[in-house]
Amino acid sequence: MSVISIVPLASNSCLYKSLMSSTHELKALCRPIATLGMCRRGKSVMASMSTSLTTAVSDDGVQRRIGHHHSNLWDDNFIQSLSSPYGASSYAESAKKLIGEVKEIFNSLSMAAGGLMSPVDDLLQHLSMVDNVERLGIDRHFQTEIKVSLDYVYSYWSEKGIGSGRDIVCTDLNTTALGFRILRLHGYTVFPDVFEHFKDQMGRIACSANHTERQISSILNLFRASLIAFPGEKVMEEAEIFSATYLKEALQTIPVSSLSQEMQYVLDYRWHSNLPRLETRTYIDILGETTINQMQDVNIQKLLELAKLEFNIFHSIQQNELKCISRWWKESGSPELTFIRHRHIEFYTLASGIDMEPKHSAFRLSFVKMCHLITVLDDIYDTFGTMDELRLFTSAVKRWDRSEIECLPEYMKGVYIILYETVNEMAREARKSQGRDTLNYARLALEEYIGAYLKEAEWISMGYLPTFEEYFKNGKVSSGHRIATLQPILTLDIPFPHHILQEIDFPSKFNELACSILRLRGDTRCYQADRDRGEKASCISCYMKDNPGSTEEDALNHINGMIEDTIKQLNWELLRPDNNVPISSKKHSFDISRAFHHLYRYRDGYTVSSNETKNLVVRTVLEPLPM
């Protein structure tokens, strides 16, 4: 049993960094606060722990449970040393010039009806152009042009799909599948019945046994389309099974190429665990090796040039924001909390992986800080805190008064101050964007979240295993999705009036589904480690309790089925044609769900961030692209 060692804490060393940048720029506003961190009688409590142990004894004789996790991977000195030349105005001017040139390419496509574009492939060229700018992460510059292109394509859409060009009578699987996916994602009404027309007499998608590049392209786009299925769309389920099988078999026979790399990426990341910036980084490499799209090389090169430049310009922004986050983490006293998982850099990678808009610094930084606080609370309630301490902390959060720290144990005082100041500062930032006070709204969400944590701590303390229904109802709240999303999205320059917020946040179906996916997927990746730490309750164990005789494999199959069904429901809530809430208002919440799904794709990449998650940080945040 390891013993908590006592390390002196220098006087006034715990400083509180301003928790926010403004919406449009980073500001280094610092405010000192006293004795922040995990402090006991003027000293910092440092837990010395081995990954093979589950308990530790503190200096006051309290036996505490500890987690199995590695320390922070990213040294602050390293982060502060990062630099990039791409913040210079000359690069922004070059990007502006390229944006104008790409708009000219779009404009040439819009003249198709006038005969300047070939009537045999103009529809495919419109779709390929939109697909490319979106996957390259530069679509924010061309929203008007994208709408013109999609309106044009949609004007030729039929119940049998479309051909590659406006004068082509026979519909084409490749163009139809690509069009279906892009049109649905942009809110156009399209039905999956179009794919029935590509089946043979046996009810299967008609294709030859040969793995030609053209046929693979068609099946690849069919697979991508199948991933945005709505509930009850059987033809989409069939298309996903068929196309996934076809692509996996094709990968075994075709040589390694840009095509095979694209296939592997789409199979690996699909849609609900795909991070836009990772896709951009990967697709730039793929296009650079000549991809399977139908555009002319001159256009590809122009798009690539802009995409690389934009990637590196944002890379310079990432470095500045990383420095801000790392300073905040260090000066908040968080390093003294050695019993928690320090994943602030990993969370920033997720935030910048789903939002590459330069002016959205406040969103990215808010998301990271809230996720860090969620981690602190998770590790206190799950492992380190005693029941008496947790009840005191829960009561203090409900009263929401800085003076409440006087009733808390020393190590909790700093945590409470960070939480209190962060939530209040985010509310002030949200007021700038939304024009109203949202603090009480955020506090209610936080109280609900803390209450769910306390209930789980009580279950652990009692050794109680709830029913699946009881566990899942509470687990959707304790997943943290709502609390990680709410305040960050309110800092955006997107209006969230009360009626729209209620369609995204609690008690909306959209919020429930996003929380459900995180709870279900998280449990499938964490239940064994949680069980080893003494936490009985998980979706897996509760399912097995409700279904005597069932195995872990049975439970996992059931949970994975629930996840697939829930993803389809979330697709519907985001993209439903009768939606009164714009897709843009729901997109950040939806993308946060994708980011968390990505984190748990193979394992608990949150607790164990030294493998795939570390590679993600390097590939999308630390490394610039060669120009």
From Swiss-Prot:
This is (+)-sabinene synthase, chloroplastic. Keywords: Chloroplast, Lyase, Magnesium, Manganese, Metal-binding, Plastid, Transit peptide. GO terms for cellular component: chloroplast. Mg(2+) 2 binds at residues 378, 382. It comes from the Eukaryota. Its cofactor is Mg(2+). Terpene synthase (TPS) involved in defensive oleoresin formation in conifers in response to insect attack (e.g. white pine weevil P.strobi) or other injury. Produces (+)-sabinene from geranyl diphosphate, but has no activity with geranylgeranyl diphosphate or farnesyl diphosphate. GO terms for biological process: diterpenoid biosynthetic process. InterPro entries: Isoprenoid_synthase_dom_sf (IPR008949), Terpene_cyclase-like_1_C (IPR034741), Terpene_cyclase_plant_C1 (IPR044814), Terpene_synth_N (IPR001906), Terpene_synth_N_sf (IPR036965), Terpene_synthase-like (IPR050148), Terpene_synthase_metal-bd (IPR005630), Terpenoid_cyclase/PrenylTrfase (IPR008930). A motif (DDXXD motif) lies at residues 378-382. Pathway: Terpene metabolism; oleoresin biosynthesis. Induction: Up-regulated by methyl jasmonate. Binds 3 Mg(2+) ions per subunit. GO terms for molecular function: magnesium ion binding; terpene synthase activity. Changing residue 448 to D: In strain: Q903; susceptible. The keyword Secreted does not apply. The highly resistant (H898) genotype and the highly susceptible (Q903) genotype differ in the nature and amount of the various terpenoids found in oleoresin. SUPFAM superfamilies: Terpenoid cyclases/Protein prenyltransferases, Terpenoid synthases. Its main location: plastid. Residues 1-46 form a transit peptide. Mg(2+) 3 binds at residue 530. It is found in: Plastid, Chloroplast. The keyword Magnesium applies. Mg(2+) 1 binds at residues 378, 382.
